[in-house]
Amino acid sequence: MNYKSKYTAAAAQLGPINPKDCKESVVSRMFDLLVEAKAQEAKLVVFPELCLTTFFPRYYITDQAKLDVFYETEAPLSLMSDIFELISKENMIISFGFAENDNGTPFNTSVYVDSSRKLIGKYRKIHLPGHTEYEPHRPFQHLEKRYFKKGNLGFPIFDTNLGKLGMCICNDRRWPETYRVLALQGCEVMTLGYNTPKHYPLAPEHDHLQEFHNHL
């Protein structure tokens, strides 16, 4: 494949998404950011982790019907038709994250879509942080391990007109094997969408790890 050797990449920062915000309103915000990126001649645009909804792992949800609303059974191509029309016209590639339900198995997923308006790559988050059960001492939760299964696609790379792309999601960035596996496959550009709270309450059981980090 003929690569574009130099191009502009953009990080599309959505900001907070309210639990009451519908997916259509979020996609409208994504479109506005994409227009801004286009004005700066960006060819690769990276949206955050789980960017179609609020970051629902913060909440303890016991009603399965309410939880199901956050998931997609496939990449929401019809919901994002205006976005895909623009990237098709401008020959762009975007990545974005969403909660995927694959035949009953939930994943924290990120995908690439190019100017063909088709998925050209998919990754499922491997290093899930947080906890599985409700912890009442926390003002908010971090329940990724409850709501998602560990990714089962490895760290693939994708041959595109912008080079060999690879991706990871949020906590994956903290583990050296993420970069090693991608690099050994010839990855040239890695994209990382993440969704990190401003404050995460202390976990006393991790104090010894914090002390270790402080002495590195």
List the model feature ranges, each with a label.
Residues 9, 36-64, 94-95, 172, ...:
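Active-site beta-strand/loop signature of hydrolases that rely on acidic residues for catalysis
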Residues 14-19, 52, 196-200:
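A short, flexible beta-alpha/helix-coil linker loop
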Residues 4-20:
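Generic N-terminal amphipathic, Lys/Arg-enriched alpha-helix
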Residues 72-93, 164, 170-216:
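CN hydrolase (nitrilase-like) catalytic-core segments centered on the catalytic cysteine
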Residues 69-167:
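Catalytic-core segment of enzymes that process non-peptidic bonds
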Residues 29-44, 78-89:
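A short, N-terminal amphipathic alpha-helix
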Residues 61-69, 136-142, 200, 205:
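Short glycine/proline- and charge-enriched loop/turn segments
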